[in-house]
Amino acid sequence: MTALERLYNAAVVPVVVLDDAADAVPTAKALLAGGVDVMEITFRTAAAADSITAVAKECPDMFVGAGTVITLEQCKKAVACGAKFIVAPGYSEEVVSWCVENNVAITPGCVTPTEIMAAMSHGLKVVKFFPANVYGGLSAMKALSGPFGGIKFIPTGGVNDKNLAEYISAPFIHAVGGSWLCAKADIAAHNFDKITSLCKEARKTALGFEIAHVGVNAGDAEESLAVCRALDAAFGFGVKGGNSSNFAGSGVEVMKSPYLGKNGHIAVKTNSIPRAAAELAKNGFTLDESTAKYKGEKMVAVYLKQEFGGFAVHLLQK
C-alpha cells in the first residue's frame, strides 16, 4: 500500500505537536487505539525529530510522517528519522524536487492554480490545502477541482468534529488534517483516553456507516411485486420497480429471484467503499469482488463474503 493510500484509508490525519519526545509513543498508541494509524508530527518544536524516531522504532503499526516541513534540511532530517511522508504548509520547489527524486511521498501546501500546476509538473496528485478556513474551504477546493480534476486535497485549518462529515464526503477530498484529535493540551496532560475517544468518533464519522435497506428474497418477480404491494397497503410505503428487484419505500428491497443470504440481505451505506473495505479487513471481513457494481470506474456496491445471522451484507456508496 502506498503512502497516499494509507492517508486516504485513514481519512483523518492527526496533526501532532509535541514539546516532549517522551510523549510521542504514548500519543501514537492512543491514536492507534482509536483506529487511526497515521500521524503527522510537526516540525514546530525542537522535539519533532526525536519524536519521529521514537514512533518509527517503537510503533511499527503507526504510519508516521513529518509536518510543517519548510526547508530541505528539515525534510532530509525527517526522512532520516523514519518519516514515511512529508507535509509542507506551502510549496517549495526544492523540497518537492528532492522528495520526488528520492521516492518520498509529499503533500505540499497549494491554494492557488499556479501552485497546483507546479505540483502537477512533478506528477503529484494530492496536495495540502492550508489554512482551509482562510482560503475558502470547501467552496474554494470545489472551484479548483474544476480545472484540476485529477487533484485531490488534504485540507487543514478549521476542520473539526462538527464539519468533518461535510469535508470528508466531498469527492475532491483525499483526507483531512487537524489537531482537534490530539490537542497539545491533552498530550501535555496525558489525556490519552480522550484522544482515543476522539479518534473513534472521527473514524465513525468518516466511514459514515448507516443501514440503507433490508433485502427480502422472493421466489420470482410476481411474488416480489406482491410483497411490495402488501407493504404499501399496510404502511403506505409506495412501490418502485427495478430490473432485479422491487422496493417498498426506500427501506425494503424485495428481490425478483433468490439471491445472496439465506434470510435475505442488509445494505449498509458508507462515505467510501475503499475506506470501508480497509476498515473491514482490519476486523477480519473481506469483500466478494465478484459481486461488485460500478458506476464508471467507481465501485458503488459490493457484498461481503461473510453472512450475519443468515443475512448477506453489501456496502452501498453514498
Indicate where each model-derived feature is located.
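Catalytic beta/alpha-barrel core
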Residues: 15-17, 37-45, 62-70, 83-91, ...
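C-terminal helical cap(s) of enzyme catalytic domains, especially alpha/beta-barrels
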Residues: 99-104, 185-207
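Catalytic cores of alpha/beta
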Residues: 27, 71-81, 114-122, 139, ...
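Conserved, mostly hydrophobic/aromatic
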Residues: 14, 31, 78, 127, ...
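Vicinal oxygen chelate
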Residues: 251-256, 281-318
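Glycine-rich phosphate-binding active-site loops on the catalytic face of alpha/beta enzymes
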Residues: 89-95, 128-138, 172-195
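N-terminal beta-strand motif that seeds the catalytic metal site of vicinal oxygen chelate
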Residues: 3-17, 203-228, 261-268
